[in-house]
Amino acid sequence: FREDEQLDERPVLALLAGSRRQEIKDNLPTMLKVATAYPGHQPVIAGAPGLEPEYYRQYIGDADVKIVFGKTYPLLSHSDAALVTSGTATLETSLFRVPQVVCYYVAAGRLASFIFRHFFHTKYISLVNLIAGREVVQELFGVRFSYDQIHDELGRVLNDHAYRSRMLDGYDEMIRLLGKPGASRRTAAVSYTHLRAHET
């Protein structure tokens, strides 16, 4: 994979910015700004199906960032960490045991955070935390979606070995839950609740 995509020797930082144009527009610029602040890692974007490289290049500009299409799983298998929008990508990232920061832009952030916390009957937006029933990964959305908070959390994920280890332990706990009887039904129910909560 590294040779095919002409990646250098630096550890890979995966950017999974969603699949819809608006979602990518809202999230990718901040994710790129954070990722390029860590030059010891090589940012690689998982391109969404149906989108062309030119769409991403308007956000990348001259930055040293690669894009891959149809290779999300190989990308994750070679990644040291990831910035991920909410959705199934958070679950996929955890199954590859890649430490992650979940970050998701929501318009009118303060209002969105208030509504989410008070009117939806779930505490989390990522499938990892929803399935585990606790905070395994940080969720930076609404008022918490900012360059500073994402930058600081990524730094912790990259450099705090004890923190990374606790996150991986949380992944293992979640995977054990998925392996119990009724896991498919439970995961489907969690996914359905998650999707309904984020319908527009």
Task: Give a label for each model feature.
Residues 1-196:
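Nucleotide-activated sugar donor-binding and catalytic core shared by glycosyltransferases
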